[in-house]
């Protein structure tokens, strides 16, 4: 498993999803955050260490790694961030990771 290649594919999917959302809907003014959670057996496992190498960090929840910047959108719209995080998680899921998008309003 080449985690860097998977990350690059997922990040490209996230960027494309963010851009497509903005093109279709603009930037809704609902502020918030979105991220990707990946469930692992242990946060010091090989899988978790590989995820950490591409920017994931240990979550406050047990056996979970998360990534807060999935694409390259730097605005505040939660909807745009959710689109990117969802696309990123879908790519990881395709490669066998238990990945999900998380979000919360600001």
Tell me what each language-model feature is.
Residues 1-57:
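N-terminal leader/targeting segments
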Residues 57-70:
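Short acidic, glycine/tyrosine-flanked loop/strand segments centered on an H-E-D-like triad
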Residues 68-106:
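Short, compact, well-ordered microdomains
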